[in-house]
UniProtKB/Swiss-Prot annotation:
Name used for this protein in its record: Probable threonine/serine transporter YbxG
InterPro entries: AA-permease/SLC12A_dom, Amino_acid_permease_CS
Bilayer-crossing regions: 17-37, 38-58, 89-109, 121-141, 154-174, 190-210, 238-258, 276-296, 331-351, 355-375, 398-418, 427-447
Family indicated by similarity: Belongs to the amino acid-polyamine-organocation (APC) superfamily.
Protein's job: Probable threonine transporter. Is also active as a minor serine permease.
Phenotypic effect of disruption: Deletion of the gene confers a weak resistance to growth inhibition by serine. The deletion of the three permease-encoding genes aimA (ybeC), ybxG and bcaP results in an unprecedented resistance to serine up to 100 mM.
Source species of the chain: Bacillus subtilis (strain 168)
GO biological process: amino acid transport; transmembrane transport
Length: 462
């Protein structure tokens, strides 16, 4: 075992597909109705508004990655351009978010497998999926990329087919005796803003959560071939991804079905495919949901392992986390993530259910921390680089105004979470988690260790 470099094993097709579908989770296929119930058809506007600010976040990250493509991505930028504690908080927040995502996705695999094998204990397919994905991540970054490529492909094809089917139903009457449904469902059941301003405002916190994980592509920077061009192309296309895969799918759902009947329909995807005569729709979507869950877990193992590696490199976690295997994989970081997932899955079946409600809730706010850090560190990055950025081909539009505007929007979403009884617990538990991370920074003397590690690095460079 040697402390080598991470291998650049992710090609352009891997990066593009991770960017296109890597963060589309189970929620879009199965849980979109609950979000729509808050606000009605105006959820379309909520997705569009959130999508614009996500675009700014990604462009800020892209501008920095073009100059400094590193595995630590936003954690490294926070460390360099804000304060070492900012990098520490960001890395642990991202690690925690992806551990929780991975746990929930593994549990989802077990639950959805019961569609075909109702008597099979749910933990068995979950553990099998985790072992397969764990092995793929340990073998090489390319094997992670191959799994994610095909998982994303399945999700993307399903969404595109669903949008095509929906357009056929809306404008040509497919599955409806030739009678086009039209667009009336967008306003005929209580109006476009059926949930009122408060419903729309509260829905923003649920919609913004649907975009969490979109920054995953930044973590691939240290292992991408030709990172400048592949990441630039992937990030530049994000606005089209948002329009097609999020807004396009939601448009079909709220146009084909009255929004106030969605909760009784089950999955809108199943209903749409069934409507045009695909009798096996439930089984097909169940398979897609399992692949979406495995994709989320796969991304979680990759991302959380790289965050532990970054913490090790920065002197903010045990040194062994920065050890690299012969295959160019952060071995101990990945193994630690797999152990954490396994423990979490076991505890899910033996611990009181309420404990995991709090654990899952705690991941929402930490999941937003990387966005704040990207925006703030980008301001410091601009100041540090100065005139060197004049010829940068990939600059964030209207910075730093858009930085401050996006930060204000994210803070407004957090305020909305506080005033909503259903999301307040997420904010409270998330703040407690972040407070514990800050306390650990001082209790364990992370600042001194970081400075000592920086001094050693500077001496080695001389």
């Amino acid at each position: 075992m040697a402390n080598k470099e991470l291998k650049r094993g992710l090609g352009a097709r891997h990066i593009q597909m991770i960017a296109l579908g890597g963060t589309i989770g189970v929620g879009l296929f199965m849980g979109s109705a609950s979000t729509i119930s808050w606000t009605g058809p105006s959820v379309l506007l909520a997705y569009a508004i959130c999508g614009i600010f996500i675009f700014f976040i990604m462009r800020a990250m892209g501008e920095m990655l073009y100059v400094e493509p590193s595995t630590g991505s936003f954690a490294t930028f926070g460390h360099q351009y804000i304060h070492p504690m900012a990098g520490y908080i960001t890395a642990w927040s991202n690690w925690f978010q992806w551990i929780i995502v991975g746990m929930s996705e593994i549990i989802a695999v077990g639950s959805y497998t019961k569609y075909w094998f109702p008597d099979l204990p749910a933990w068995i397919p979950g553990i099998v999926a985790m072992v397969i994905l764990g092995a793929a991540n340990l073998i090489s970054v390319k094997s992670f990329g191959e799994f994610e490529f095909w998982f994303a492909m399945i999700k993307i094809v399903t969404i595109i087919l669903m949008i095509i089917a929906g357009i056929g139903i809306i404008f040509f009457g497919f599955g409806n005796g030739g009678d086009a449904i039209g667009l009336s469902n967008l306003w005929s059941h209580g109006g476009f803003f059926a949930g009122g301003f408060s419903g729309f405002f509260f829905a923003l916190s649920l919609v913004i959560a649907a975009y969490q994980g979109v920054e995953l592509i930044g973590i691939t920077a240290g292992e991408a071939k030709d990172p400048q061009n592949t990441l630039r192309n992937a990030i530049q296309s994000i606005i089209w991804r948002i329009l097609i895969f999020y807004i396009g799918a939601i448009f079909v759902i709220v146009t084909v079905y009255p929004w106030d009947e969605l909760n009784s329909l089950g999955s809108p995807f199943v209903s749409t495919f069934s409507k045009i005569g695909i009798t096996a729709a439930a089984g097909i979507i169940n398979f897609v949901v399992i692949t979406a869950a495995m994709s989320g877990c796969n991304s979680g193992i990759f991302s959380a392992g790289r965050m532990l590696y970054t913490l090790g490199v920065n002197g903010q976690a045990p040194k062994f986390f920065k050890k690299i295997s012969r295959n160019g994989v952060p071995l101990y970081g990945t193994i630690a993530v797999l152990i954490g997932l396994a423990v979490g899955v076991v505890l899910n079946y033996i611990a009181p259910p309420k404990i995991f409600v709090y654990v899952y809730s705690a991941s929402v706010l930490p999941g937003m921390i990387p966005w704040f850090i990207i925006l703030i560190s980008h301001i410091g990055f601009r100041k540090a680089k100065g005139a060197a950025l004049d010829k940068h081909p990939f600059k964030m539009p209207f910075a730093p105004f858009t930085n401050y505007l996006t930060i204000a929007f994210l803070l407004m979403v957090l305020v909305g979470m506080w005033f909503n009884d259903d999301t307040r617990i997420s904010l409270i538990v998330g703040v407690i988690f972040l407070a514990l991370v800050v306390i650990s920074y001082y209790v364990f003397g992370i600042g001194k260790r970081t400075q000592a590690n920086l001094t050693k690095s500077e001496q080695a460079a001389e």
